[in-house]
Protein backbone atom coordinates (compact mmCIF):
# COMPACT_ATOMS: atom_id res chain seq x y z
CA UNK A 1 0.00 0.00 0.00
CA UNK A 2 1.30 3.44 -0.93
CA UNK A 3 1.71 6.13 1.69
CA UNK A 4 0.79 9.59 0.50
CA UNK A 5 1.37 12.98 2.05
CA UNK A 6 -1.67 15.18 2.71
CA UNK A 7 -0.69 17.30 -0.29
CA UNK A 8 -0.54 14.23 -2.55
CA UNK A 9 -3.93 13.05 -1.25
CA UNK A 10 -5.37 16.50 -1.92
CA UNK A 11 -4.16 16.26 -5.52
CA UNK A 12 -5.68 12.77 -5.88
CA UNK A 13 -9.02 13.98 -4.52
CA UNK A 14 -9.08 16.91 -6.92
CA UNK A 15 -7.75 15.21 -10.06
CA UNK A 16 -8.43 11.46 -9.79
CA UNK A 17 -10.99 10.85 -7.03
CA UNK A 18 -11.44 7.21 -8.07
CA UNK A 19 -7.75 6.56 -7.26
CA UNK A 20 -8.22 8.18 -3.84
CA UNK A 21 -11.29 6.01 -3.21
CA UNK A 22 -9.37 2.84 -4.17
CA UNK A 23 -6.45 3.81 -1.93
CA UNK A 24 -8.78 4.62 0.97
CA UNK A 25 -10.43 1.17 0.85
CA UNK A 26 -7.08 -0.36 1.88
CA UNK A 27 -6.19 2.32 4.44
CA UNK A 28 -6.98 2.60 8.12
CA UNK A 29 -7.21 5.82 10.11
CA UNK A 30 -7.00 8.27 7.21
CA UNK A 31 -6.01 11.68 8.64
CA UNK A 32 -6.91 14.71 6.54
CA UNK A 33 -7.31 17.04 9.49
CA UNK A 34 -6.53 20.72 8.94
CA UNK A 35 -6.45 20.34 5.13
CA UNK A 36 -7.57 23.30 3.01
CA UNK A 37 -9.99 22.06 0.33
CA UNK A 38 -11.31 25.61 -0.27
CA UNK A 39 -12.70 26.43 -3.73
CA UNK A 40 -12.41 22.83 -4.95
CA UNK A 41 -14.98 20.84 -6.90
CA UNK A 42 -15.24 17.46 -5.15
CA UNK A 43 -17.48 14.79 -6.62
CA UNK A 44 -18.10 11.16 -5.59
CA UNK A 45 -15.31 11.01 -3.01
CA UNK A 46 -15.45 8.55 -0.11
CA UNK A 47 -14.53 10.37 3.11
CA UNK A 48 -16.27 7.76 5.29
CA UNK A 49 -14.58 7.42 8.71
CA UNK A 50 -11.90 9.97 7.71
CA UNK A 51 -10.54 12.48 10.25
CA UNK A 52 -11.28 15.87 8.65
CA UNK A 53 -11.15 17.79 11.94
CA UNK A 54 -10.58 21.55 11.40
CA UNK A 55 -10.38 21.24 7.61
CA UNK A 56 -11.85 23.86 5.29
CA UNK A 57 -14.37 23.21 2.53
CA UNK A 58 -15.30 26.88 2.22
CA UNK A 59 -16.57 27.92 -1.22
CA UNK A 60 -16.40 24.26 -2.39
CA UNK A 61 -18.81 22.45 -4.65
CA UNK A 62 -19.40 19.00 -3.10
CA UNK A 63 -21.64 16.46 -4.85
CA UNK A 64 -22.34 12.84 -3.85
CA UNK A 65 -19.59 12.90 -1.22
CA UNK A 66 -19.72 10.21 1.47
CA UNK A 67 -18.95 11.66 4.93
CA UNK A 68 -20.41 8.63 6.78
CA UNK A 69 -18.84 8.41 10.25
CA UNK A 70 -16.32 11.16 9.48
CA UNK A 71 -14.93 13.51 12.13
CA UNK A 72 -16.00 16.93 10.86
CA UNK A 73 -15.43 18.75 14.16
CA UNK A 74 -14.86 22.48 13.57
CA UNK A 75 -14.85 22.06 9.77
CA UNK A 76 -15.52 25.18 7.68
CA UNK A 77 -18.30 24.73 5.11
CA UNK A 78 -19.04 28.46 4.70
CA UNK A 79 -20.54 29.34 1.30
CA UNK A 80 -20.13 25.73 0.10
CA UNK A 81 -22.60 24.11 -2.28
CA UNK A 82 -23.19 20.64 -0.82
CA UNK A 83 -25.56 18.41 -2.81
CA UNK A 84 -26.66 14.82 -2.11
CA UNK A 85 -23.93 14.17 0.46
CA UNK A 86 -24.19 11.61 3.26
CA UNK A 87 -23.35 12.89 6.76
CA UNK A 88 -24.80 9.82 8.56
CA UNK A 89 -23.14 9.08 11.90
CA UNK A 90 -20.61 11.87 11.37
CA UNK A 91 -19.60 14.47 13.95
CA UNK A 92 -20.34 18.06 12.87
CA UNK A 93 -19.86 19.63 16.31
CA UNK A 94 -18.71 23.21 16.01
CA UNK A 95 -18.71 23.12 12.21
CA UNK A 96 -19.49 26.40 10.43
CA UNK A 97 -22.04 25.94 7.65
CA UNK A 98 -22.96 29.62 7.38
CA UNK A 99 -24.28 30.71 3.98
CA UNK A 100 -23.93 27.15 2.64
CA UNK A 101 -26.42 25.35 0.40
CA UNK A 102 -26.72 21.83 1.87
CA UNK A 103 -29.52 20.33 -0.20
CA UNK A 104 -30.68 16.71 -0.50
CA UNK A 105 -28.22 15.63 2.22
CA UNK A 106 -28.67 12.87 4.82
CA UNK A 107 -27.91 13.79 8.45
CA UNK A 108 -29.12 10.56 10.14
CA UNK A 109 -27.43 10.17 13.56
CA UNK A 110 -25.14 13.12 12.75
CA UNK A 111 -24.07 15.03 15.90
CA UNK A 112 -24.84 18.69 15.17
CA UNK A 113 -24.14 20.22 18.61
CA UNK A 114 -22.81 23.74 18.10
CA UNK A 115 -23.04 23.57 14.31
CA UNK A 116 -23.52 27.07 12.87
CA UNK A 117 -26.39 27.11 10.36
CA UNK A 118 -26.78 30.87 9.89
CA UNK A 119 -28.36 31.59 6.51
CA UNK A 120 -27.86 27.93 5.52
CA UNK A 121 -30.17 26.44 2.91
CA UNK A 122 -31.12 22.89 4.00
CA UNK A 123 -33.90 22.36 1.44
CA UNK A 124 -34.84 18.68 1.00
CA UNK A 125 -32.16 17.48 3.43
CA UNK A 126 -33.12 14.78 5.95
CA UNK A 127 -32.59 16.05 9.49
CA UNK A 128 -35.31 13.85 11.02
CA UNK A 129 -32.83 11.70 12.97
CA UNK A 130 -30.05 14.28 13.46
CA UNK A 131 -28.62 14.41 16.97
CA UNK A 132 -28.37 17.62 19.03
CA UNK A 133 -29.92 19.78 16.30
CA UNK A 134 -31.54 21.89 19.01
CA UNK A 135 -28.00 22.80 20.14
CA UNK A 136 -27.08 24.15 16.69
CA UNK A 137 -26.99 27.90 16.03
CA UNK A 138 -29.35 29.18 13.37
CA UNK A 139 -31.19 32.37 12.48
CA UNK A 140 -34.33 33.59 10.76
CA UNK A 141 -32.58 33.29 7.38
CA UNK A 142 -31.88 29.56 7.77
CA UNK A 143 -33.95 27.66 5.20
CA UNK A 144 -35.24 24.39 6.66
CA UNK A 145 -36.55 21.31 4.84
CA UNK A 146 -40.22 20.33 5.07
CA UNK A 147 -41.52 19.22 8.48
CA UNK A 148 -41.41 15.53 7.57
CA UNK A 149 -37.62 15.87 7.17
CA UNK A 150 -37.21 17.49 10.61
CA UNK A 151 -37.08 15.97 14.12
CA UNK A 152 -40.45 15.81 15.87
CA UNK A 153 -41.28 18.94 17.85
CA UNK A 154 -38.19 20.82 16.62
CA UNK A 155 -38.84 24.56 16.63
CA UNK A 156 -37.35 26.22 13.55
CA UNK A 157 -38.33 29.69 14.78
CA UNK A 158 -35.32 31.88 15.26
CA UNK A 159 -34.34 32.09 18.90
CA UNK A 160 -31.78 34.09 20.76
CA UNK A 161 -28.59 32.22 21.55
CA UNK A 162 -25.77 33.07 23.94
CA UNK A 163 -24.20 35.52 21.47
CA UNK A 164 -27.26 37.76 21.69
CA UNK A 165 -27.39 38.04 25.48
CA UNK A 166 -27.44 41.58 26.83
CA UNK A 167 -26.30 43.02 30.16
CA UNK A 168 -29.01 44.32 32.48
CA UNK A 169 -27.83 47.91 32.00
CA UNK A 170 -28.22 47.52 28.22
CA UNK A 171 -31.95 46.94 28.61
CA UNK A 172 -33.91 50.17 28.53
CA UNK A 173 -36.59 50.51 31.19
CA UNK A 174 -39.28 53.06 30.45
CA UNK A 175 -40.10 55.65 33.10
CA UNK A 176 -43.59 55.50 34.53
Predicted ranges, named:
Residues 4-176:
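Tandem repeat scaffolds
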Amino acid sequence: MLDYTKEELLSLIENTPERFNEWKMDSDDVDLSEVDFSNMVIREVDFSDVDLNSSSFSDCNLTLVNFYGADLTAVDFTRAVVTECDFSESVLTGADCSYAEMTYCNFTDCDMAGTVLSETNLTSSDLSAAENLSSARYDSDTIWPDDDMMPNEFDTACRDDLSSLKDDEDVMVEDY
